[in-house]
From Swiss-Prot:
It catalyses: tRNA(Arg) + L-arginine + ATP = L-arginyl-tRNA(Arg) + AMP + diphosphate. Its EC number is 6.1.1.19. GO terms for biological process: arginyl-tRNA aminoacylation. The modification N-acetylmethionine is found at residue 1. Interacts (via N-terminus) with AIMP1 (via N-terminus); this stimulates its catalytic activity. Interacts (via N-terminus) with LARS2 (via C-terminus). Monomer. Part of a multisubunit complex that groups tRNA ligases for Arg (RARS1), Asp (DARS1), Gln (QARS1), Ile (IARS1), Leu (LARS1), Lys (KARS1), Met (MARS1) the bifunctional ligase for Glu and Pro (EPRS1) and the auxiliary subunits AIMP1/p43, AIMP2/p38 and EEF1E1/p18. Interacts with QARS1. Part of a complex composed of RARS1, QARS1 and AIMP1. One of its GO terms (cellular component) is cytosol. It is found in: Cytoplasm; Cytoplasm, Cytosol. Residues 1-72 are annotated as: Could be involved in the assembly of the multisynthetase complex. The gene is RARS1. Belongs to the class-I aminoacyl-tRNA synthetase family. This is Arginine--tRNA ligase, cytoplasmic. The keyword Aminoacyl-tRNA synthetase applies. It comes from Pongo abelii. The alpha-helical N-terminus (residues 1-72) mediates interaction with AIMP1 and thereby contributes to the assembly of the multisynthetase complex. L-arginine binds at residues 200-202, 211, 384, 388, 412.
Length: 660
C-alpha cells in the first residue's frame, strides 16, 4: 500500500503542475484578446477540465488508500509532512521547494508536533519583494489544511509556529494496529541493497577492545536496515594478506615441518605471532625466507597457500568465538579476495590519465584531498589504497550496492574520503544516486581517560573483557539474591543478557563520533540510562500481565476487541511516545547515530514508569491482595511498550529475558 500511496502522490503532483501550466496558458490567451486563438482556447479549456476531473479521481483514490488499514506503523512526522506539504502547496502554489519543517513539540503546552515552515516561507517571499508576516503565512497554511485522519486541531503561537494536536482516536487506532500486527515498518528498502563493512580484524592477531566498537555499531546498523526491508550484506574486510604472512608461514615451516600432512597444533596464535615477529626482527636469514614466502604466496604456490589457509583457519576459529558470543553474523571477504583485481585497478587509473609517478611510486591526486593515494609501491607491491579501491568497485559493479557503509574508526576518515572522491572522479558512482558513507567512531578510553589498556600496558583482549563482564554480571545478580529465585537456566540467561547487553549498550548509547570511557561499574548500574536498568524495566513490564494471570492469547483477543483509552494525561503521553518509534528509526537510517535509539528506549521506559505510578493496570483489595479489576486497555499499553522495547533491543543486538 505504501508504494501505491507514493505513486499516487507523485502522479497528483504531476497533474497539478499540468493544470497550473494549462491555466496559465488559458489566462495568457484570454489576456491577448486575439479572437483568432479561440479554437486553441477552447481546446485548452477542455483539456484542463479533463485533467481536473482526473485529478479529483486521483485525490479520492489516494484518500481511500490512506484510509485502508495498514499493518505497518505510521511515521507520524512523515504523515504530517504530507498534510502540511499539501497545505503549503495550495496556499503558495508559485513557491518552488518551500521549507517543510515538522518536529515533535518540546513541551506539552505546544501540542504534540509543530510546523515551523512559516518563517522560512516569509524569507522566500521577501526575496520576491513580497513582505508577509510569518503569522499571516501560518494562518494561510492552516486554512488550506486538507481533511485528514490524524490532526485534532492546530493553533498558531508566537511569530508563526503552528502547534499540532493529534486525534486521540488516531493514536488509539495506531496502537491497536501495532498490537494486532506486531511492530512493523513500511518496506522502505524494498529492492535496495546495503553493504555494511565492519569489524575487520587482522588474521593471526586477537581481537582487542579497539575492534569492539566497529563490531557492535556495524551489527546494529545492519539489523536496522534489515528491519527497514533492505537487502543487507555484512562484510568482514579482514586483514588476511601482506608481508606479515611471510614470517608466519616461514615460522610454521620450521615449527611444524610436516604441516602438509599433519594438522599443526598451533595453539595460542598470539604467542605464535610474537615468536615469528621476534625472529623476523632478529634473524636475517629468517627475514629473507619470510620475504620469499610472500612472493610464493602471491604466486599461488600450493604448499605456501595451504600454510596460509591453515593460519587463517586457526585465527578464524578464535574470531568466531567472539562473534558467536556477541550474536554477530558476518561474511568474511578479506583483502585476499581483491588481489586478482588490483592490476586492473592500476591500469584503469593509468588509462584515464590520473596516475603520476613519484620516486618510483604510482600515485593518484584527488581534487579536494590533500594526500594522494598510492596505488603501486616502488617495489611493485599494492597498498591498502589499492585494495580499498578494488573493494569499492567490486561492491558497486558486481554486488550492485545502492548504499555502502564503512564502520571504521575516525582515524581513517581522510583515507575513506579520498577513496570515495577517487571513485567518483573515475566515474564509478554518483553520490546523488548511490550513498557511500564512512560511519566513523571515537576510541575506547579507560577510567583514567587514556587509551584502554591492561595494568601492564597491553591492549585489552576482547575475550578477556567479555569474560570479565560475565563474572561481574553474575556477582550483581547474586548481590540482589536473584540466584535464590531463578532456576539455573534462567540465572545463566540473565547473566549473559546483562553482561553482553551492558557492553553493547554502553557503546551504542554514546554518540559514535566521540571517545567513550569504558567502566563496568557504570554500565552495570541499574539506575539511569544503562542496559541494566532497561533490561530490569523490561522484565517488570512483561511480568504485569503474568502476575494478573493474563496470557498471550487473552492479550491478543483484547487487542482486537478493546479500545485503548487515552483519557489520563499519562496514558496520552505514553501512547504518543510509543508512536514515535518509526520516526526515530527513520532519523537513524539517515544519520546512522544509534544513540538516538538508546535515548528513545530510555525515554519510553521512564514515560512508562510515570504512567504505571499514576494509572492502575490491576486494582487489588488492599487487605487481601485479591485482584478486583483488570483495566485491560492499560494492560494493552504495557504490552505495546514491551513490544517496541523488544524490537529496539533487537536492533541494538541485546537479548532481553522474561525473568531476571
Amino acid at each position: 500500500m505504501d508504494v501505491l500511496v507514493t505513486e499516487c502522490s507523485a502522479r497528483l503532483l504531476q497533474q497539478e503542475e499540468e493544470i497550473k501550466s494549462l491555466t496559465a496558458e488559458i489566462d495568457r490567451l484570454k489576456n491577448c484578446g486575439c479572437l483568432g486563438a479561440s479554437a486553441n482556447l477552447e481546446q485548452l479549456q477542455e483539456e484542463n477540465l479533463k485533467l481536473k476531473y482526473r485529478l479529483n479521481i486521483l485525490q479520492k483514490s489516494l484518500q481511500a488508500e490512506r484510509n485502508k488499514p495498514t499493518k505497518n506503523m505510521i511515521n507520524v512526522i512523515s504523515r504530517l509532512q504530507e498534510v502540511f506539504g499539501h497545505a503549503i502547496k495550495a496556499a503558495y502554489p508559485d513557491l518552488e521547494n518551500p521549507p517543510l519543517l515538522v518536529t515533535p513539540s518540546q513541551q506539552a503546552k505546544f501540542g504534540d508536533y509543530q510546523c515551523n515552515s512559516a518563517m522560512g516561507i516569509s524569507q522566500m517571499l521577501k526575496t520576491k519583494e513580497q513582505k508577509v508576516n510569518p503569522r499571516e503565512i501560518a494562518e494561510n497554511i492552516t486554512k488550506h489544511l486538507p481533511d485528514n485522519e490524524c490532526i485534532e486541531k492546530v493553533e498558531i503561537a508566537g511569530p508563526g509556529f503552528i502547534n499540532i494536536h493529534l486525534r486521540k482516536d488516531f493514536v488509539s487506532e495506531q496502537l491497536t494496529s501495532l498490537l494486532v500486527n506486531g511492530v512493523q515498518l513500511p518496506a522502505l528498502g524494498e529492492n535496495k541493497k546495503v553493504i555494511v563493512d565492519f569489524s575487520s580484524p587482522n588474521i593471526a592477531k586477537e581481537m582487542h577492545v579497539g575492534h569492539l566498537r566497529s563490531t557492535i555499531i556495524g551489527e546494529s546498523i545492519s539489523r536496522l536496515f534489515e528491519f527497514a526491508g533492505y537487502d543487507v550484506l555484512r562484510l568482514n574486510h579482514i586483514g588476511d594478506w601482506g608481508t606479515q604472512f611471510g614470517m608466519l608461514i616461514a615460522h610454521l615451516q620450521d615449527k611444524f615441518p610436516d604441516y602438509l600432512t599433519v594438522s599443526p597444533p598451533i595453539g595460542d596464535l598470539q604467542v605464535f605471532y610474537k615468536e615469528s615477529k621476534k625472529r623476523f626482527d632478529t634473524e636475517e636469514e629468517f627475514k629473507k625466507r619470510a620475504y620469499q614466502c610472500v612472493v610464493l604466496l602471491q604466486g599461488k604456490n600450493p604448499d605456501i597457500t595451504k600454510a596460509w589457509k591453515l593460519i587463517c583457519d586457526v585465527s578464524r576459529q578464535e574470531l568466531n568465538k567472539i562473534y558467536d558470543a556477541l550474536d554477530v553474523s558476518l561474511i568474511e571477504r578479506g583483502e585476499s579476495f581483491y588481489q586478482d583485481m588490483m592490476n586492473d585497478i592500476v591500469k584503469e587509473f593509468e588509462d584515464r590519465g590520473f596516475v603520476q609517478v613519484d620516486d618510483g611510486r604510482k600515485i593518484v591526486f584527488v581534487p579536494g584531498c590533500s594526500i594522494p593515494l598510492t596505488i603501486l609501491k616502488s617495489d611493485g607491491g599494492y597498498t591498502y589504497d589499492t585494495s580499498d579501491l578494488a573493494a569499492i568497485k567490486q561492491r558497486l559493479f558486481e554486488e550492485k550496492a545502492d548504499m555502502i557503509i564503512y564502520v571504521v574508526d575516525n582515524g581513517q576518515s581522510v583515507h575513506f574520503q579520498t577513496i570515495f572522491a577517487a571513485a567518483q572522479m573515475i566515474g564509478w558512482y554518483d553520490p546523488k544516486v548511490t550513498r557511500v558513507f564512512h560511519a566513523g567512531f571515537g576510541v575506547v578510553l579507560g577510567e583514567d581517560k587514556k587509551k584502554f589498556k591492561t595494568r601492564s600496558g597491553e591492549t585489552v583482549r576482547l575475550m578477556d573483557l567479555l569474560g570479565e563482564g560475565l563474572k561481574r554480571s553474575m556477582d550483581k545478580l547474586k548481590e540482589k539474591e536473584r540466584d535464590k529465585v531463578l532456576t539455573a537456566e534462567e540465572l545463566n540467561a540473565a547473566q549473559t543478557s546483562i553482561a553482553y547487553g551492558c557492553v553493547k549498550y554502553a557503546d551504542l548509547s554514546h554518540n559514535r563520533l566521540n571517545d567513550y570511557i569504558f567502566s563496568f561499574d557504570k554500565m552495570l548500574d541499574d539506575k539511569g540510562n544503562t542496559a541494566a536498568y532497561l533490561l530490569y524495566a523490561f522484565t517488570r513490564i512483561r511480568s504485569i500481565a503474568r502476575l494478573a494471570n493474563i496470557d498471550e492469547e487473552m492479550l491478543q483477543k483484547a487487542a482486537r476487541e478493546t479500545k485503548i483509552l487515552l483519557d489520563h494525561e499519562k496514558e496520552w503521553k505514553l501512547g504518543r511516545c510509543i508512536l514515535r518509534f518509526p520516526e526515530i528509526l527513520q532519523k537513524i537510517l539517515d544519520d546512522l547515530f544509534l544513540h538516538t535509539l538508546c535515548d528513545y528506549i530510555y525515554e519510553l521506559a521512564t514515560t512508562f514508569t510515570e504512567f504505571y505510578d499514576s494509572c492502575y493496570c490491576v486494582e487489588k483489595d488492599r487487605q487481601t491482595g485479591k485482584i478486583l479489576k483488570v483495566n485491560m486497555w492499560r494492560m494493552l499499553l504495557c504490552e505495546a511498550v514491551a513490544a517496541v522495547m523488544a524490537k529496539g533491543f533487537d536492533i541494538l543486538g541485546i537479548k532481553p529475558v522474561q525473568r531476571m
